[in-house]
Design a protein with these regions (language model features):
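Interdomain hinge/linker elements that couple catalytic modules in large macromolecular machines
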Residues: 1-5, 131-193
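Pre-Walker A adenine-sensing motif
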Residues: 2-19
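Hydrophobic anchor at the beta1->P-loop junction of P-loop NTPases
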Residues: 27
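Conserved lysine of the Walker
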Residues: 35-36
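Short glycine-rich substrate-engagement loop in P-loop NTPases that contacts/grips substrate
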Residues: 46-77
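Conserved catalytic/switch belt of AAA+ P-loop NTPases
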Residues: 87-111, 115-120
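Short regulatory helix/loop adjacent to the ATP-binding pocket of P-loop NTPases
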Residues: 111-127, 140-143
């Protein structure tokens, strides 16, 4: 197994570069592709806020101005798709204080947050899409599977390299969770059976 927190992702420099040119960087991509790990590795100087936590999410939803004021130097706002209305408040915040790279948002690409970011933050946000680990990234880390078949079957999700879990078990559960959570939300399907 390999410590994925030590893996240098190709998107690292892109996050840094966009942070010099935009007040907000939005790191998006599929679930479990390493967004949180990359955000924390790229910007260890920023406070970290996990909006999956019900208390943090409630604070951001109920008092967005107070929530953002809690982080005068900015923060990593992880799983920002849970508070899509925050985009308008971030717009107002960065229009007053134009410091570059102050906010680093992470979240899965979902229509609600994508629409909010596109409408409210145009010209204020640099977007980086983080895909699962590439063959080049694995080769650089010395973790490239020995056969192309293994690489294609395994894919590049970090959990498959740093956990003791079979590819079959992990991918089966990943797909099931995706269908149950994301597809239902996107299509408003009530019964997937």
């Amino acid at each position: 197994k390999y410590d994925m927190s030590m893996l240098h992702r190709d998107a690292h420099e892109t996050v840094e570069r966009l942070g010099r040119g935009f007040p907000i960087v939005w790191l998006t991509g599929p679930r479990q592709s390493g967004k949180t790990t990359l955000a924390r590795a790229t910007r260890p100087d920023l406070a970290y806020v996990n909006l999956e936590r019900p208390d943090e999410r409630a604070f951001a939803q109920e008092d967005p101005r107070g929530f953002l004021a809690t982080y005068p130097d900015g923060a990593i706002l992880d799983e920002v798709q849970h508070v899509p209305d925050l985009a308008s408040w971030l717009q107002a915040d960065v229009d007053v204080r134009r410091q570059m790279g102050r906010w680093l948002l992470t979240g899965s690409q979902q229509p609600a947050i994508a629409q909010g970011v596109s409408q409210s933050l145009a010209g204020r946000v640099g977007r980086v899409e983080l895909l699962p680990i590439s063959g080049r990234e694995l080769a650089r880390a010395g973790s490239l599977p020995t056969s192309l078949d293994t690489l294609l079957f395994t894919g590049g999700f970090p959990a498959l390299f740093d956990r003791d879990v079979s590819v079959h078990d992990w991918l089966g559960n990943y797909v099931a969770t995706y269908v149950e959570r994301d597809v239902r939300m996107l299509t408003a399907v009530r019964d997937l059976d």
